[in-house]
């Protein structure tokens, strides 16, 4: 890989509905990496997700096709396995794509992970991505897919399925 160049870090002040990167995504880099450190949910049973805007668009509702699977081992040792998450993938959907599910809000609960977005400024091809996350449930979640637009992607937003992001930071790097 190339040199990681930090572009921007967003840190939750404890009351964020979302964390949005609305500048810094351009043709300078062919790959953008988002690093999530100790993202904490306001309420239990939340899903951290993302969506994007194409150039000139709003609403964070671009069309995606995705996959989602996980290896898990419950903290209480009451469940373990490997599973494909049919309720978390999309087939040409416009919802926020789940990156980490079943997040809780206990004081020691958080998730950390990485999202890779490839060639977001390319105007010929769709935009590919993949992510890997871990959380207190001892879940290793893998998500991959593509954003079905040939328009440049200029904005990326992260939010919980309900409630606020209560802590943590997301850093965006160009590679």
Predicted regions and their residues:
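Surface-exposed molecular-recognition determinants
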Residues: 1-175
């Amino acid at each position: 890989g190339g040199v990681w160049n930090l572009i921007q870090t967003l840190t939750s002040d404890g009351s964020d509905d979302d964390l949005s990167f609305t500048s810094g995504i351009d043709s300078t880099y062919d790959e953008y990496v988002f690093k999530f450190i100790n993202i904490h949910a306001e309420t239990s049973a939340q899903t951290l997700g993302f969506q994007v805007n194409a150039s000139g668009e709003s609403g964070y509702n671009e069309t995606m096709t995705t996959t989602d699977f996980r290896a898990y081992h419950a903290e209480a040792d009451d469940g373990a396995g490997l599973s494909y998450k049919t309720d978390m993938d999309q087939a040409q959907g416009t919802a926020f794509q789940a990156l980490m599910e079943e997040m809780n809000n206990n004081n020691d609960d958080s998730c950390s992970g990485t999202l890779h977005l490839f060639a977001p400024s390319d105007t010929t091809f769709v935009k590919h991505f993949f992510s890997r996350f871990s959380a207190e449930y001892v879940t290793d979640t893998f998500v991959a897919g593509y954003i079905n637009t040939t328009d440049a992607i200029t904005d990326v937003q992260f939010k919980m399925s309900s409630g606020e992001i209560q802590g943590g930071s997301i850093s965006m790097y160009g590679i």
